[in-house]
Swiss-Prot record:
It comes from Pseudomonas fluorescens (strain ATCC BAA-477 / NRRL B-23932 / Pf-5). It is a peripheral membrane protein. Residues 125-128 are annotated as: G4. This is GTPase Era. Residues 8-176 form the Era-type G domain. CDD domains: Era, KH-II_Era. GTP binds at residues 16-23, 63-67, 125-128.
Amino acid sequence: MTDSTATRCGYVAIVGRPNVGKSTLLNHILGQKLAITSRKPQTTRHNMLGIKTEGAIQAIYVDTPGMHKSNEKALNRYMNKTASAALKDVDVVIFVVDRTKWTDEDQLVLERVQYVQGPVILAINKTDRIEDKAELMPHLTWLQEQLPNAEIVPVSAQQGHNLEALEGLIAKHLPENDHFFPEDQITDRSSRFLAAELVREKIMRQLGAELPYQITVEIEEFKQQGKTLHIHALIIVERDGQKKIIIGDKGERIKRIGMEARKDMELLFDSKVMLNLWVKVKGGWSDDERALRSLGYGDL
């Protein structure tokens, strides 16, 4: 029997295929926007910690890139390696799946999760959209057969439905430990990293079907001057055509990207923000391991 008053702290990996709701789930658990989201697969590229401290419990969530089948480019290999690494040395794994849809990429994640030694929680997302819950049963039964030791929790990452039950299960599995981070810290990532991610999110949301995935963002300046935070961001693409798409007709699109990113930055950093954006062509960066490392993508 666990001691409900004990101080507990541990790492919780959130894994799943691309675009299944992992980052949205993390944001709702934290009660604020930390991880960027869009309707496009592979929005998340890096592991990022989201830290939630409530009383004696500190859960350190690891938001991961969606595992996907393509290893075509160095960037794809980096994301898959990053997501797989998150399954090691964590105390709990949350495997996020769709309420009924199952893909080859879900199967890929399942095959990795089946080797996990510790507690696994299956978070069945978007269950609020099903009126007749009996429709879920065949899928849930099959999932339970694949992961017989996993606990199953139906949730809605978008609406925040049933997250209390999910967090209760997580807390139960965290080891007794002193807290690793101060109570008011919510992430391990720098403000520069968060600013770059916000710009990239707005690009992904603005471009829709025109979206070139070969885009990254580098913060060249991040400086507080008086009451204003000055941020210079460089948007890196692979081709001249992509540069033209991002800039848009008479610069209208990049202006919208900047306005939306600035609004979110002012909320996140609690400061007036002066944001300047530039676009640069760096051919083949997404398949160049040296370039990826220089842009903060770590070891491949």
